[in-house]
Amino acid sequence: MIAKRKVYIETYGCTLNQSDSDIISLSLKKSGYELTTSESFADAVVINTCTVKGATENKISERMKKLTQNKVPLVIAGCMSANERLIKKINPHAAIVGTTSITSVAEAINDALSGNGTVFKNREDKETIGRPVSAPIMRIPICEGCTSRCHFCQTKIARPFLFSYQPKTILKWVEDGIKQRVKEIQLTAMDAGVYGMGLETQIDLPSLLSAICETEGDFRVRLGMINPQHAKRMCEPLISALAHEKMYKFIHIPVQTGSERVCKEMNRQHTVKNFYEIVDVMRKKIPNITIATDIIVGYPTETKEDFEETVRLIETIQPDIVNISKFSPREGTIAKKMKQLPTQIVKKRSAKLAEVARQIQTEKNKKFIGKVVHVMITERQQQNGRHGGDYTGRTNEYKQVAVKGFKGKIGEWVKVKIIGANYGGLIGKLKNSCKK
């Protein structure tokens, strides 16, 4: 009997990338490959890459160099696949799989094992690809691409095509997941707000969310990132959809800066004022909603005054989650051609904003101490877990909770008393199981 070839998949980046890795895994299994949890046992390694941040790309590049030195056959997938020159400079024999060609990964592995270094960039029909299920969480892409032309963004270059999945396809994936005991559906996208564009069917994001929530079963839905211009355009119907009991009371709206001037120079398709307005309406209609946002610190044209406006925005809005990135010039973007700010200034500003955000997040989370909340257990932690809890879960507001004393099954709802908190989440003590 011939032993199956073993493949190790390493994933970087957002939930959309993680969803692509799910597809890669399923495709490899169907092609007869065996997946392994360590590169040590692998005949080949697939790196599903991310290029949003320069630091991440540098980390991946170093990883590629190490694997190349160890003579490991490599397949490079994800957004970094657009930078063939860099990949081939590190490893001329690596196979490259574009973001539209991920089901070609089995062929690419054969190619990498032969050392041919072929580039696969054909466009595939992703509608026909199944979605692997790993209960209790299932990632489902609803659309790809975006309508923006941000001057700092390389993802648009790596994923240039705009398309939406048919609603019947998405609903079928949801139904299949629920049948296999999925409890959390994560809807992934570069920008969920573009959903419906390009489809002959007249449907938009709020309508899709409502249709998903009509599916029978005990589950929750987490909506992926939506840019401010689309959140503003569909604000009222979006709020109505988020109010459904099956929707996590959570929204991720990246504003990127608190300066109107910098926002315009980034070529963002919204204003900072739009962001203030959206958050205000969201909190009035859904008072307990968790607000997440993204900030880029140190954009080339950002002045000290611009940065202080960003600090004021965070202090005023007080988001529950702030993802802070130090600006890094990305290949092929307009912002890369601009005169860059000194590294020390960017580091100093980033550290200051991070401290402001941590204080806000910590104080907001501390308000939960003493409260009893419903938590869906989603994950078991290794080595007795973070904060001493064996399991972690999510509240209806998508707050992460480390749960002490839980002995049940992943996917169960439990009542938890919050006994501690930090900027990253909550710490709870089990009270009893509950039915939702």
Regions found by a protein language model. Give the residues of each.
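Proteins enriched for Cys/Gly/acidic motifs involved in redox and nucleic-acid/cofactor modification
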Residues: 1-195, 210, 247, 251, ...
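Short aromatic/hydrophobic contact patches that present stacked aromatics
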Residues: 8, 13, 139-141, 222, ...
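Alpha-helix N-cap/loop-to-helix initiation residues
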Residues: 17, 53-56, 231, 299, ...
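Conserved SAM/AdoMet-binding glycine-rich loop
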Residues: 74-75, 83, 179-303
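Glycine-centered loop/turn positions within well-structured domains
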Residues: 103, 148, 193, 260-261, ...
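Conserved, mostly hydrophobic/aromatic
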Residues: 170, 187, 223, 253, ...
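Flexible glycine-/small-residue-rich
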Residues: 225, 255-257, 326, 377-379, ...
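Terminal RNA-binding accessory module
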Residues: 329, 337-436
